[in-house]
Amino acid sequence: MQADWKPTASIEQLRQRAVLIANIRQFFAQRGVLEVDTPAMSHATVTDIHLHTFQTEFVGPGYAQGRHLHLMTSPEFHMKRLLAAGSGCIYQMAKAFRNEENGRHHNPEFTMLEWYRVGFDHHQLMDEMDDLLQLILKCGTAERMTYQQAFLTVLGVCPLEGSMAELKSVAARLGLSDIAEPEEDRDTLLQLLFSIGVEAKIGQQVPAFVYDFPASQAALAKINPNDPRVADRFEVYFKGIELANGFHELDNPQEQLTRFEQDNAKRIDMGLTPQPIDYHLIAALESGLPACAGVALGVDRLIMLSLGCTHIDEITAFPFPIA
């Protein structure tokens, strides 16, 4: 039996992909943002309950018993260490790895564009990202709405004040009762409603920036000083596809450590394995992270949309099934 050896993307699509990646690099070069390169493996990893990592083991000299390592889901932690060391504004296009879905919009190994702008808040970063999207997607200016506005407009329920019963009632309307009824975690329920009920209804003509996520979904973002119910976090959607996730970056080491510990406690409650906390990152925050905003963007999805493709395999040479 002959193995399926050919790339799933045409050579012409790969040429166009290369041009778009070159355009992205030029975009940042023109703005004086430094390109960096950080490890694909780490001793620590993300604690987020919704992210699943690949693990490997180093068995070289001095590690006869083996040393567990994680493939990075994002270069974020290493890039923040560079920021704390005085790098200034930085970006990179890195391979990221998530042990999750494989399908039309997902590949376990993918290309991520991540950048950090010193002195920016998340609104200024949204402005810059809007410029990049217009360049690559040839689209109009993005629309913007708060997380609360998106829920109220599309689903008619407030994500910040609505009760669990109200949220489950909306889920029933969407035909999601089997999943929603037994769910006890508010954020998991909100994410279900957002992914099924909201994502497909926004950002159809131009990209949509959704910001002011619930504080309980802050991750590595600051809590909004004017409204502690929400975090200075945004996500970007276009034609039903999530493209990016950005933060006005949290710079308080104790608060960040507490969030990591809370994630791991929740992991234990859910029967998941707690993840090793990145104390190098905590030490970098203690040293002093400059005020900044950062965002991670899925390059493969961006290129797929730019070239009018409907499957990520069309712009990826060797996706997971034939890698």
Swiss-Prot record:
GO terms in the biological process aspect are: lysyl-tRNA aminoacylation
Which positions are annotated as binding ATP? R98, N99, E100, N107, E242, L243, G298
Q: What is its EC number?
A: 6.3.2.-
Instruction: Provide the alphabetized UniProt keywords.
Output: ATP-binding, Ligase, Nucleotide-binding
Please write the reaction equations for the catalytic activity of this protein: D-beta-lysine + L-lysyl-[protein] + ATP = N(6)-((3R)-3,6-diaminohexanoyl)-L-lysyl-[protein] + AMP + diphosphate + H(+)
The protein's matches in InterPro entries, at most eight in alphabetical order, are given as: Aa-tRNA-synt_II (IPR004364), aa-tRNA-synth_II (IPR006195), aa-tRNA-synth_II/BPL/LPL (IPR045864), EpmA (IPR004525), Lys-tRNA-synth_II_C (IPR018149)
Does NADP count among this protein's keywords? no
The source's domain of life comes to Bacteria
The keyword Acyltransferase is annotated on this UniProt entry: no
- Quote a single Gene Ontology cellular component term: cytosol
For the ligand (substrate), the binding residues are S74, P75, E76, Y116, E249
Q: Name one Pfam family in it.
A: tRNA-synt_2
Task: Name one molecular function that GO assigns to this entry.
Answer: tRNA binding
Family of the protein in this entry: Belongs to the class-II aminoacyl-tRNA synthetase family. EpmA subfamily.
Q: What does this protein do?
A: With EpmB is involved in the beta-lysylation step of the post-translational modification of translation elongation factor P (EF-P). Catalyzes the ATP-dependent activation of (R)-beta-lysine produced by EpmB, forming a lysyl-adenylate, from which the beta-lysyl moiety is then transferred to the epsilon-amino group of a conserved specific lysine residue in EF-P.
Q: How does it assemble?
A: Homodimer.
Question: Which named protein is this?
Answer: Elongation factor P--(R)-beta-lysine ligase
Q: What is the lineage of its organism?
A: Bacteria, Pseudomonadati, Pseudomonadota, Gammaproteobacteria, Vibrionales
Q: Which gene encodes it?
A: epmA
